[in-house]
């Protein structure tokens, strides 16, 4: 019997706050370029080039759909393969939906699912690929394989896997190096983590899994039939919408929320662990990002326009301004267009407290950056004051803004580069570089980029209310545009 095809299932729905102010609710860390020229999501997908995989499935939520689609398009991985969760229900249901879809896509086969987080770093990519190849026959045998990271130090922020006896070798193979799992352990205290470190039989839980789609669904049906039944219904009613696989919100919101660890892994007798050293990090804090980054002779990590004098072991990031640091040590400084973080490295775990304060004060800095992505391009809110807002808008070639109007504001557009095709009422006009056009309050208008280069323009809005919800669409260019 030939081996089943491998389908990577990439979980990209998180909204983490531990890397604020770079990571925001609408632009979390999986979409950031933290190590190299690609984002963590893109790197996760490109890492699979060392394996023989079918096109991957990426699971995300409604809010992130356009960012995910654009990042997949940039690396030529966009192919109707983004599953949109209408509401978050943790990993067990998300993986179940993926398993049903994989079986539907491969009706004559029982594909292997390789479950990955979109926001992890794996430095030793060839070792990772070798580990997956070694696990393939084990998973084809019907085992549920999890990959345990050989710990480098006593870490209290990770869950652990306690190994048992060596698993039964495959026919024709010597010891495969896979162990049965005794138990999964939640994040330990410091004393317990030290014991795990010295025991030699505990591994960090990486959240990387490999199993047959049918095996996962069988175990889920055995231990959590309530989740299985809802996901079966949801998967059967899913439908394709452009690059997205959409699920029924009415059905999916009835699904219990549960992690794969609690729903299946802690209960199944089919689980084996493969210990690996793949240079893994979940990049869960500014400290861990400093740990894995390339450093200067003084131990500094500097990203952006940075000047330093007499500094040591700092992480300094600048998005849009010159940052100068003098005489500091073991600090984190992160500058974005609308926020600056300054912290001791030893205190960065308290970043979540700042995010909680922003939420209580109903500020927007925890939700989004100044720069916001849309299916047609992006905009950057440059300035705002009483009765006015200034944006820089970039429209991709061939894309445009749907026919719309505003009740509370008028707009002036000044084209910086490219060509704008503007429909205002019953008239259409081309507006080119150094030209402008006025959109009166209450007027119906649309904007297109008919050219082959990006359209850059400045928008100045003025009126009593300037919120993004004062957009009355009369004809949608993109389904579910915002």
Curated annotation (Swiss-Prot):
Keywords, in A-Z order: GTP-binding, Lipopolysaccharide biosynthesis, Nucleotide-binding, Nucleotidyltransferase, Transferase
One GO BP annotation of this record: lipopolysaccharide biosynthetic process
Role this protein plays: Involved in GDP-mannose biosynthesis which serves as the activated sugar nucleotide precursor for mannose residues in cell surface polysaccharides. This enzyme participates in synthesis of the LPS O antigen.
EC number of the protein: 2.7.7.13
Organism: Escherichia coli O157:H7
Protein name: Mannose-1-phosphate guanylyltransferase 2
Family affiliation: Belongs to the mannose-6-phosphate isomerase type 2 family.
UniProt keyword Membrane present: no
Pathway recorded for this protein: Nucleotide-sugar biosynthesis; GDP-alpha-D-mannose biosynthesis; GDP-alpha-D-mannose from alpha-D-mannose 1-phosphate (GTP route): step 1/1
InterPro entries (alphabetical): GMPP_N, Man1P_GuaTrfase/Man6P_Isoase, Man6P_isomerase-2_C, ManC/GMP-like_b-helix, Mannose-6P_isomerase_type2, NTP_transferase_dom, Nucleotide-diphossugar_trans, RmlC-like_jellyroll
Enzyme superclass (EC): transferase
